[in-house]
């Protein structure tokens, strides 16, 4: 153990697995993390001047409702998927959403938004939150679709998955990967 920081001059060679468990990314609220069968994992890497943030979500156990409403565990507050900061994610230039499994049960039209508050609840209108901004209007997601995120998240805002159409049901399938690319400013 070398303490909290180690510096190596020259080239570092590693044989075997490199575990970067300390590279945790955004932390989701309980409206995402308490869904039955829901998976949320995130990581951040910083190499040179490039930052890469990844958020992996299995939607199983979350719920969708009316158009423009927040997705999360039914009736649960804090249904955000985390926040980004310049210190943790760099200055974000852009991103992409990859659908790895077509959403089923709940609505497949899943948009990405951010707002000031972390407390947004499932089934609440995203427009009920302060300073909300739509980052991505995806249309119906299908396995294999990759969509650019034209509006990157503003620093220290909370991100939400939001229904683009109305299907009041629980998700039984659906896996998405959200990635952001940032730089040292």
Predicted regions mapped to residue ranges:
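Short structured motifs
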Residues: 38-39, 78-82, 96, 142-146
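Residues at beta-strand starts and edge strands
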Residues: 49-53, 91-93, 108, 157, ...
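C-terminal interaction-tip segments
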Residues: 44-48, 165-185
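Noncatalytic modules at the cell exterior or secretory-pathway interfaces
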Residues: 149-170
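A short beta-strand-loop element at or near the start of a globular domain
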Residues: 49-88
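Beta-rich globular "head" domains
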Residues: 77-114, 177-182
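Terminal beta-strand-rich extracellular "head" domains
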Residues: 104-148
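Intrinsic low-complexity, repeat-rich intrinsically disordered segments enriched
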Residues: 1-49, 120
């Amino acid at each position: 153990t070398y303490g909290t920081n180690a510096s190596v001059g020259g080239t570092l060679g590693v044989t075997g697995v490199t575990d970067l468990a300390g590279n945790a990314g955004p932390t989701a609220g309980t409206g995402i993390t308490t869904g039955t069968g829901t998976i949320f994992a995130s990581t951040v890497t910083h190499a040179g001047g490039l930052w890469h943030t990844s958020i992996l979500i299995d939607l199983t156990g979350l719920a969708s409702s009316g158009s423009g409403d927040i997705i999360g565990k039914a009736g649960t507050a804090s249904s955000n998927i985390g926040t980004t900061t310049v210190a943790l994610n760099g200055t974000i230039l852009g991103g992409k959403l990859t659908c790895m499994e077509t959403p089923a049960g709940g609505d497949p039209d899943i948009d990405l938004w951010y707002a000031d508050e972390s407390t947004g609840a499932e089934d609440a209108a995203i427009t009920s939150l302060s300073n909300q901004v739509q980052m991505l209007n995806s249309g119906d997601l299908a396995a294999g679709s990759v969509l650019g995120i034209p509006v990157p998240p503003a620093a220290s805002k909370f991100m939400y998955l939001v229904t683009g159409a109305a299907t009041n049901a629980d998700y039984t399938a659906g896996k998405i990967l959200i990635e952001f690319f940032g730089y040292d400013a």
